[in-house]
Regions:
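Non-cysteine beta-strand/loop elements that form the S-adenosyl-L-methionine
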Residues: 54, 252-268, 358-368
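Phosphate/diphosphate-binding loops
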Residues: 223-254, 336-343, 347, 378-399
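Residue-level recognition of conserved beta-strand edge/terminus positions
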Residues: 94, 124, 363, 466-469, ...
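Divalent metal-binding segments
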Residues: 2-230, 236-244, 265-298, 302-311, ...
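Active-site microenvironment of metallo-dependent hydrolases
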Residues: 1-29, 81-87, 180-196, 200-201, ...
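His/Asp/Glu-enriched, well-ordered alpha-helical/loop segment
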Residues: 297-307, 314-316, 320-337, 341-342, ...
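Extended low-complexity acidic/polar segments
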Residues: 117-118, 279-280, 351-374, 501-502
Length: 502
């Protein structure tokens, strides 16, 4: 999309950019009370926009047990036992990565019972699509064994592994223990983690009732009432299929992480071919094609932008089919419907997406985590390895890509993600650093209908700016991930200045 003019100085007044220039023209504005900030030759950029962020969950998880780096059941068990010894009434843990575990599988409830059997233990996988409970937790949360996604053994007893509808139900039950005051306290404490990475706007993917039925969600209701209180622009995607609820709230967006399929890690992302390491398995879609068509039709009638969480190419087929069906009655291009992730999009699907005006919200960090030779993508996809996250071909088809971290799946830093897009493990899928930067600036604004307000440094736009710690023109591609943010400005106010702590 657009690349703004290069300039040497920017004048801010209140919450807007009012003047750009080169040379010493800024001197005419040097008056008492004007603060000057010298970037000292470092690069100044628009504030970063993260288009796929789970704000409330990320904030709450700061107090959970982090299983990052636990590569054996033994290491996992040690961390959980420490949490039990601290006297936690409920042990909540996240970032359990089955791909990194030596055992290459999730623990069972019986194995968790051996670690802790006198209180609920709740483990969330790194891809946030699988939950593992001990026996105490299964009883504590009163999980119905008949729910879709409950893992059962040969005796029809629960294994402790929950996916799909069952996992969504569990998320709802866990969040019931948190009050609005808990949400606020966690959010206030967490926001500096975004500011120090230069993020000034997020698309907040909130709620977990899209697989469990209609009705209000406590996370979403909290943000509807309180988002404007924070020094961060929060654009809410209400993760539900209840169109009437979202329309009545006066919101413009629905879905986000609206699961159309599962993930590669759990062999549940919906494919048109078998998994390389599990012949005969192709994953599955959560919704029928008929339901998808009627849902999209209702959203279009109510003017709602939709975010579809679709990873495998069969799931992407379902989304594009529903959009093509809606396009028979109306022009869907101006609605900028989105596919989140779209990791295995085919060439013919790129052509359809471009024709329908679909925006792809993608996560370059996935390639750094799973895309390397011998990594999870290659294990699951075999011959199709190399077809994931094809940023170059997608852009060449005229599709807008915006970027998101999907935190806590990937780390927050947009610069790390930008590095991943530029240094894709499959070189032909890489893009230029300018294209990668646009994923988190002007393209990010476009994906949220905010391109007239932010996303570039231009007169009249929001005074959302960041100063990096160096000149990007002097940074090699291999060093992009090392670039830090020195200063973050939101609506003309400094909200972050770097210290050694960040």
């Amino acid at each position: 999309m657009e690349q703004g003019p290069r300039c040497e100085w920017v004048l801010l007044e209140e919450d807007k950019i009012v003047k750009l220039g080169n040379g010493d023209g800024y001197r005419q504005y040097e008056t008492e009370g004007i603060r000057q900030i010298d970037a000292a030759g470092a690069t100044v950029l628009p504030g970063f926009i993260d288009n796929h962020f789970h704000l409330i969950n990320s904030a709450l998880m700061e107090s959970w047990v982090n299983l990052e780096g636990a590569d054996t059941f033994t290491e996992m068990g040690e961390r959980l036992r420490c949490a039990c010894a601290e006297g936690r009434k409920v042990v909540l843990a996240y970032n359990l990565s089955v791909e990194e575990l030596k055992e290459k599988r999730f623990p069972s409830r019986i194995e968790l019972d051996r670690i802790c059997d006198d209180r609920p233990v709740f483990l969330l996988s790194r891809d946030v699509h699988t939950i593992v409970l001990n026996t105490f937790a299964i009883l504590y949360y009163k999980m119905p064994f008949a729910a879709n996604g409950v893992g059962l053994d040969d005796r029809k007893m629960p294994t402790g592994i929950f996916r799909g509808q069952a996992a969504a139900l569990l998320e709802t039950k866990v969040n019931e223990i948190f009050t609005p005051e808990d949400f606020d306290e966690a959010t206030q404490a967490f926001l500096p983690a975004l500011f120090c990475e230069g993020i000034t706007t997020i698309a907040a993917m909130e709620g977990s009732n899209h697989l469990t039925g209609h009705g209000h969600d406590s996370e979403c209701d909290f943000l509807v009432k309180n988002a404007a209180r924070y020094p961060l622009s929060i654009e809410l995607f209400y993760q539900t299929t209840d169109v009437r609820l979202v329309a009545d709230e006066g919101l413009r967006r629905i879905g986000g992480a609206l699961y159309i399929d599962g993930t590669f890690g759990t062999h549940s992302a919906s494919l048109t071919t078998d998994y390389a390491d599990m012949p005969g398995v192709r994953g599955y879609n959560f919704f029928t094609d008929g339901y998808m068509r009627s849902f999209v039709e209702e959203c279009c009638e109510n003017g709602l932008q939709i975010g579809f969480d679709a990873i495998g190419d069969a799931a992407i087929d379902s989304v594009l089919d529903a959009l093509e069906y809606a396009a028979r009655k109306r022009n869907v291009r101006p609605m900028r419907h989105r596919i989140e992730h779209a990791e295995l999009i085919r060439i013919d699907q790129m052509e359809k997406a471009a024709r329908l005006g679909v925006v792809l919200c993608m996560q370059p960090g996935y390639e750094a985590r799973w895309g390397f030779p011998g990594g999870m993508y290659e294990e699951r996809l075999g011959a199709r390895y190399g077809e994931t996250n094809r940023f170059r071909e997608i852009l060449d088809h005229g599709i807008t890509i915006c970027g998101g971290s999907d935190h806590s799946v990937c780390e927050i830093s947009p610069m790390v993600a930008i590095s991943s897009a530029v240094n894709h493990p499959v070189p032909e899928n890489s893009i230029t650093r300018q294209e990668a930067l646009e994923m988190y600036t002007i393209n990010g604004a476009y994906a949220l209908f905010l391109e007239e307000e932010r996303g570039s440094i231009a007169e009249g736009k929001a005074a959302d700016l960041i100063i990096l710690d160096r000149n990007l023109d002097e940074v090699s591609d291999s060093d992009l991930a090392e670039v830090k943010v020195d200063l973050t400005i939101k609506n003309g106010e400094i909200i972050y200045e770097r210290t050694d702590a960040c």
